[in-house]
Swiss-Prot record:
Modified residues (Phosphotyrosine): 47
Record bears the keyword GTP-binding: no
Gene Ontology cellular-component terms listed: Arp2/3 protein complex; cell projection; cytoplasm; cytosol; nucleus; site of double-strand break
Record flagged with keyword Nucleus: yes
Cited SUPFAM superfamilies: Arp2/3 complex 21 kDa subunit ARPC3
GO-annotated biological processes: Arp2/3 complex-mediated actin nucleation; regulation of actin filament polymerization
Organism: Bos taurus
Gene3D superfamilies given in the database record: Actin-related protein 2/3 complex subunit 3 (1.10.1760.10)
Recorded GO MF terms: actin binding
Family as reported in the entry's similarity comment: Belongs to the ARPC3 family.
Identification of the protein by name: Actin-related protein 2/3 complex subunit 3
InterPro entries in UniProt: ARPC3 (IPR007204), ARPC3_sf (IPR036753)
Keywords of this entry: Acetylation, Actin-binding, Cell projection, Cytoplasm, Cytoskeleton, Isopeptide bond, Nucleus, Phosphoprotein, Ubl conjugation
Length: 178
């Protein structure tokens, strides 16, 4: 069974580094264009997460795949936090905190995927990339809470938390032991 790839790459998509700056349906402020279609990259990453997380190798077919990889790894980080939450409201607070926490971007020490991501070309691109990744993190965390928490008992679903120990591409956005 092959890994799932992003279908959202258009020829006129703007790039930051070698990562696609894709439109998203977001309530958070950031550089991403507003998405008008039903499905955006965050929906795609959440939908394909359970299948893609099992892959140790992932062939990058376009720049949108790099965005998909980042969100997939971020979902893994979110699940580590959400499994410890007792309610959806606590989960939303954790996701907000994780989304705005300082994080490394491509080209910085501590970023685990420097081999496959190009660093920003200049200071302006650096700021756009950081803002875009933060916008993706905030939106992903919020939407993931909707999927992970069972509306009947307000607890995290075991069908999501069972993926906490899985590492996509043998990588993690957090440091070793976190």
């Amino acid at each position: 069974m092959p890994a799932y790839h992003s279908s959202l790459m258009d020829p006129d998509t703007k790039l930051i580094g070698n990562m696609a700056l894709l439109p998203i349906r977001s309530q958070f402020k950031g550089p991403a264009p507003r998405e008008t279609k039903d499905t955006d990259i965050v929906d795609e990453a959440i939908y394909y997460f359970k299948a893609n997380v099992f892959f140790k190798n992932y062939e990058i077919k376009n720049e949108a795949d790099r965005t998909l990889i980042y969100i997939t790894l971020y979902i893994s980080e979110c699940l580590k936090k959400l499994q410890k939450c007792n309610s959806k409201s606590q989960g939303e607070k954790e996701m907000y905190t994780l989304g705005i926490t300082n994080f490394p971007i491509p080209g910085e020490p501590g970023f685990p995927l420097n081999a496959i991501y190009a660093k920003p070309a200049n200071k302006q691109e650096d700021e756009v990339m950081r803002a875009y990744l933060q916008q993706l993190r905030q939106e992903t965390g919020l939407r993931l809470c909707e999927k992970v928490f069972d509306p009947q008992n307000d607890k995290p679903s075991k069908w999501w938390t069972c993926f906490v120990k899985r590492q996509f591409m043998n990588k993690s956005l957090s440091g070793p032991g976190q």
